[in-house]
Design a protein with these regions (language model features):
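Glycine-rich, histidine-containing beta strand-loop boundary motifs that form or position
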Residues: 116, 129-131
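General structural signal for secondary-structure boundaries
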Residues: 1-4, 96, 134, 145
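An aromatic- and glycine-enriched ligand-binding surface/loop that stacks and positions planar moieties
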Residues: 1-49, 125, 129, 150, ...
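Conserved, well-structured interaction surfaces
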Residues: 9, 15-23, 48-122, 138-148, ...
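Short glycine/proline- and charge-enriched loop/turn segments
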Residues: 131-138
Length: 162
């Protein structure tokens, strides 16, 4: 499947496409997952938006339900899967050390970034370190304690810096 340095570099660039998708969802972004949940927020005058927007109120009051757009972590896990593909397949390709470090470092850093947001918003969560290559129950792993999620983040950041 991956046969050239170009394949690995293209897949690494694809990580950022996936990451942009994760944060381009209507209300699933750092503002909604972060600042809006911890303090007063108001839309500026002239935006045509109201603080009474139901999803915003759910976020602010911490009364989210599964139907709220801001509760969907699937785009973050799609990004993690792209990172896992790079981490699995790039080392099997002959390429320059600089490009290998670029690919693996980016994959580790972005995977850590995604897990940071998952841990911050949801706490306990599945920790997946291999690409999804099948179907069935294997693609629905159980949640790990949030401490294990943070340990994965730390490992990835150390490896990315290394």
């Amino acid at each position: 499947m991956w046969t050239s340095e170009s394949d690995a570099l293209t897949a690494t660039t694809g990580i950022y496409y996936r990451l942009r998708q994760a944060f381009a969802q209507s209300k699933a972004n750092p503002f909604f997952w972060g600042e809006l949940r911890v303090g007063p927020a108001m839309w500026g005058k002239g935006t045509g938006r109201s603080l009474c927007d139901n999803d915003m109120l759910d976020v602010m009051l911490n009364t989210l339900s599964a139907s709220d757009a801001s509760t969907d972590w699937s785009y973050l896990y799609t990004t993690i899967d792209q990172c896992n593909q790079v981490l699995k397949y790039a080392p099997g390709i002959g390429m320059s050390e600089d490009n290998m470090n670029y690919c693996l470092g980016n994959a580790r850093f972005i995977r850590a970034y995604c897990y940071f947001w998952i841990a911050r918003v949801w706490g306990d969560a599945p920790v997946i370190t291999t690409p999804t290559e099948g179907t069935g129950e294997a693609i629905y792993p159980s949640r790990h304690p949030v401490a294990e999620v943070y340990a994965r983040i730390e490992d990835d950041l150390n490896a990315a810096a290394g």
